[in-house]
Amino acid sequence: MTLILPKDYHPSLTIRDTEAAIVFIRENFQDKIADKLNLQRMSAPMFVEKSTGLNDNLNGIERPVAFDMKAMPDDTIEVVHSLAKWKRLALKRYGFGMHEGLYTNMNAIRRDEDLDNFHSIYVDQWDWEKIIAKEERNIETLKTTVKQIFKAIKETEKELSARYPGSTYRLPSDITFITTQELEDRWPDLAPEEREDKIAKEKKAVFLMKIGDKLKRSGKPHDGRAPDYDDWELNGDLLFWYEPLKRKIEISSMGIRVSEESLKEQLKKAHTEERSDLPFHKMLLEGKLPYTIGGGIGQSRLCMLLLGKAHIGEVQASIWPPEMIESCKAADIKIL
């Protein structure tokens, strides 16, 4: 997606009022999500050792920011892309019990991100993970959890609207569940991104399930997913139709995590079976890690959505190409 400059856009809040609203959204939403999912806030790393295999490989082509450190010259340190695998290990290390979980304020750098209205090299999200029983690894558990997150977003919207009545973007009351295969069957000639826009415009709020495995018609995945955290049959993305930009906006990517069996199967499909020898993967394959559900919820994305902003740079401080900054300035988009 390229930069979209909506016509007649004018922010309804000053920069300082926007900053106050951001704090209000963040504090309210994280309290609600912690309560609904039984999560405890925990400290999280900004970087991990490459040798542990704990970093998120995303689609497998993005380069992590990496460096060495004086005290450990023989190892490469990587800035995290996300904490998808770290959280599952942390639940075991910190002694969390059944149906207990954690959330973190995760900050990441994704240097290879294609920049546009929704995407920045700086990623901030609530990364969360919760222990479930093996028999709870099913679609119903996934849907129930999505509904709890959706409810937390709606409650935050209501409270924000009471404080900033003219500056809150209105969200739909209900959410629709649909699979990537159903989208391909309905619109086989469209690209995956176009299908997402179509269904989001039609339903307004959608949880798109089963991302990562090959689709039947095209023989290609709807979108890339690393093989070693989400179970591709039990995951999905939370999407909203965003009228100011006339596009869908993804607020969360989440899923029930791989079991020993599905990890083995997905590593094979992804031709990355060598990861089986990494410490995290060994523990998982040996049944030493709890079964979990987890995901990431974009902090800046949620603020952008609820405040009706035209660019994510209005709700977070990052680095943008000079020509993008100039184009935004001309369109009254106030980049921080």
UniProtKB/Swiss-Prot annotation:
Keyword Cytoplasm in annotation: yes
Gene Ontology MF terms in the entry: aspartate-ammonia ligase activity; ATP binding; catalytic activity, acting on a protein; transferase activity
The entry's keywords: Amino-acid biosynthesis, Asparagine biosynthesis, ATP-binding, Cytoplasm, Ligase, Nucleotide-binding
Metabolic or biological pathway: Amino-acid biosynthesis; L-asparagine biosynthesis; L-asparagine from L-aspartate (ammonia route): step 1/1
Pfam families, per the entry: AsnA (PF03590)
InterPro entries, per the entry: aa-tRNA-synth_II, aa-tRNA-synth_II/BPL/LPL, AsnA
Catalysed reactions, semicolon-separated: L-aspartate + NH4(+) + ATP = L-asparagine + AMP + diphosphate + H(+)
Record-linked CDD domains: AsnA
This protein's record includes keyword DNA repair: no
UniProt-listed PROSITE patterns: AA_TRNA_LIGASE_II
Location (main, coarse): cytoplasm
Enzyme class, spelled out: ligase
Protein name (Swiss-Prot/TrEMBL): Aspartate--ammonia ligase
Originating organism: Lactobacillus johnsonii (strain CNCM I-12250 / La1 / NCC 533)
Gene that specifies this protein: asnA
